C-alpha cells in the first residue's frame, strides 16, 4: 500500500513539474530582417504578434477593442500582397520552363500561401474570441482566459513559422526554376547564334564579300518592311472607307427621321394654328355682339 502511495506521489510531482516546465521559445527567423519585401512584411506581422503575446496591461486594454485585430488584418493583407507580387515576378522569369512544370510549382506555392493566410486568419479569430470571452467572462477568471490565450498563441506561432518555412522553400524552388530556365534560354540563344555564324562562314564565297551580303540582306529587309507598310496603309484605307460608309448611312437615317418628324409635326402645328385662329375669330364675334346689344337698347 505504501508503495502505491509513493508511486502516486511521484506521478503527481512529475505532472506538476511538466506543467511548469517552460516552453521553448520559437526561434526568430533572421532572414526576415533583410530578406525579400514579402519576408519583411511578414516580419512586421510576426513582431506585432509577439508584442500581443506578452499580454501586457496595454495589450489587454487594446484587446478589449478592435484595434489589435484591425492592425493585424492590415499587416496580413500587406504580407499576402507582397507574396503575390513576388510570385508574379518569379512566374515571369519561368517563361522558358515547360508548362506542366510551371503549373505544378504554381499549385504547390498556392497551397503554401493558402495555409499561411489560414494561420494568420486563425490568429485574428482567436483574438476576437478572447475579446468576446472577456466581455462575457462565462464563469471564468481573467487569469484563466489569458493563460488559455497565451497557450493558443504559442501553438499558432509555431504553426505559422512552419508554414512560412514551407512558403520560403517553394519560393526557393520557384527562384531556382527561373534561374535554370533563364540559363537554358541563354544557352539556346548562344547555340543558335553559333550555328548561324558557322553557317554564314561556310556559305560565304570569295567572290561575294561580306559587305555585299549585308547589302543584300538589307535590301531584303527593306522590301519586307515596305510590303508590311503597304499592307498597313491598305488596311487603314479600308477602315477609313468603312467609317465613311457608316457615317453616310447614319446621316441618311438622320435626314429620313427629320423628314418624317417634319411631315408629322408641321400638319399638327398648322391644324393648331387654324383652330386658334377660329377660336380668336369666335371670341371677337362674341365680343362684338355683346357690345352692339346695349347700343340697340338705347
UniProtKB/Swiss-Prot annotation:
Subcellular location as annotated: Secreted; Secreted, Extracellular space; Secreted, Extracellular space, Extracellular matrix; Extracellular vesicle
UniProt family annotation: Belongs to the apolipoprotein A1/A4/E family.
UniProt-listed Gene3D superfamilies: Apolipoprotein
Region named 8 X 22 AA approximate tandem repeats: 74-244
Residues holding heparin: 156-159, 218-225
Molecular function terms from GO: cholesterol transfer activity; heparin binding; phosphatidylcholine-sterol O-acyltransferase activator activity; phospholipid binding
Chain residue ranges for the region called Specificity for association with VLDL: 260-272
Role description: APOE is an apolipoprotein, a protein associating with lipid particles, that mainly functions in lipoprotein-mediated lipid transport between organs via the plasma and interstitial fluids. APOE is a core component of plasma lipoproteins and is involved in their production, conversion and clearance. Apolipoproteins are amphipathic molecules that interact both with lipids of the lipoprotein particle core and the aqueous environment of the plasma.
Pfam family, one: Apolipoprotein
GO cellular component: chylomicron; extracellular exosome; high-density lipoprotein particle; low-density lipoprotein particle; multivesicular body, internal vesicle; very-low-density lipoprotein particle
Residue list for modification Phosphoserine: 141
Region entry LDL and other lipoprotein receptors binding, spans: 152-162
Annotated protein name in UniProt: Apolipoprotein E
Superkingdom of origin organism: Eukaryota
Spans annotated as Lipid-binding and lipoprotein association: 204-272
Subunit and partners: Homotetramer. May interact with ABCA1; functionally associated with ABCA1 in the biogenesis of HDLs. May interact with APP/A4 amyloid-beta peptide; the interaction is extremely stable in vitro but its physiological significance is unclear. May interact with MAPT. May interact with MAP2. In the cerebrospinal fluid, interacts with secreted SORL1. Interacts with PMEL; this allows the loading of PMEL luminal fragment on ILVs to induce fibril nucleation.
PTM section of the record: APOE exists as multiple glycosylated and sialylated glycoforms within cells and in plasma. The extent of glycosylation and sialylation are tissue and context specific. Glycated in plasma VLDL.
GO biological processes: acylglycerol homeostasis; cholesterol efflux; cholesterol metabolic process; lipoprotein metabolic process; melanosome organization; phospholipid efflux
Sequence repeat residues: 74-95, 96-117, 118-139, 140-161, 162-183, 223-244
Record key words, sorted: Chylomicron, Endosome, Extracellular matrix, Glycoprotein, HDL, Heparin-binding, Lipid transport, Lipid-binding, Oxidation, Phosphoprotein, Repeat, Secreted, Signal, Transport, VLDL
Keyword Secreted: yes
PANTHER family per UniProt: APOLIPOPROTEIN, APOLIPOPROTEIN E
Signal sequence interval, chain numbering: 1-18
Organism: Dasyprocta punctata
Entry-annotated residues carrying Methionine sulfoxide: 137
Amino acid at each position: 500500500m505504501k508503495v502505491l502511495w509513493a508511486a502516486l506521489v511521484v506521478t503527481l510531482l512529475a505532472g506538476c513539474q511538466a506543467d511548469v516546465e517552460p516552453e521553448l521559445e520559437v526561434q526568430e527567423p533572421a532572414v526576415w530582417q533583410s530578406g525579400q519585401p514579402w519576408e519583411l512584411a511578414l516580419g512586421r506581422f510576426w513582431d506585432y504578434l509577439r508584442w500581443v503575446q506578452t499580454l501586457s496591461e496595454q495589450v489587454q486594454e487594446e484587446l478589449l477593442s478592435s484595434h489589435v485585430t484591425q492592425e493585424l488584418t492590415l499587416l496580413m493583407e500587406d504580407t499576402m500582397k507582397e507574396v503575390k507580387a513576388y510570385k508574379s515576378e518569379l512566374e515571369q522569369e519561368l517563361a522558358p520552363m515547360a508548362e506542366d512544370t510551371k503549373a505544378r510549382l504554381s499549385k504547390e506555392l498556392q497551397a503554401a500561401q493558402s495555409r499561411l493566410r489560414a494561420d494568420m486568419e486563425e490568429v485574428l479569430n482567436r483574438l476576437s474570441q478572447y475579446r468576446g470571452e472577456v466581455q462575457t467572462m462565462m464563469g471564468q477568471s481573467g487569469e484563466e482566459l489569458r493563460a488559455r490565450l497565451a497557450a493558443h498563441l504559442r501553438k499558432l506561432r509555431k504553426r505559422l513559422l512552419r508554414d512560412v518555412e514551407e512558403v520560403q522553400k517553394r519560393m526557393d524552388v520557384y527562384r531556382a526554376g527561373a534561374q535554370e530556365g533563364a540559363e537554358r534560354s541563354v544557352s539556346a540563344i548562344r547555340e543558335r547564334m553559333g550555328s548561324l555564324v558557322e553557317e554564314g562562314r561556310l556559305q560565304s564565297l570569295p567572290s561575294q564579300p561580306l559587305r555585299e551580303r549585308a547589302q543584300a540582306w538589307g535590301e531584303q529587309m527593306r522590301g519586307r518592311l515596305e510590303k508590311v507598310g503597304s499592307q498597313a496603309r491598305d488596311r487603314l484605307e479600308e477602315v477609313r472607307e468603312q467609317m465613311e460608309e457608316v457615317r453616310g448611312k447614319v446621316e441618311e437615317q438622320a435626314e429620313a427621321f427629320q423628314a418624317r418628324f417634319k411631315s408629322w409635326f408641321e400638319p399638327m402645328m398648322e391644324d393648331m394654328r387654324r383652330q386658334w385662329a377660329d377660336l380668336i375669330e369666335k371670341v371677337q364675334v362674341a365680343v362684338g355682339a355683346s357690345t352692339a346689344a346695349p347700343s340697340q337698347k338705347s
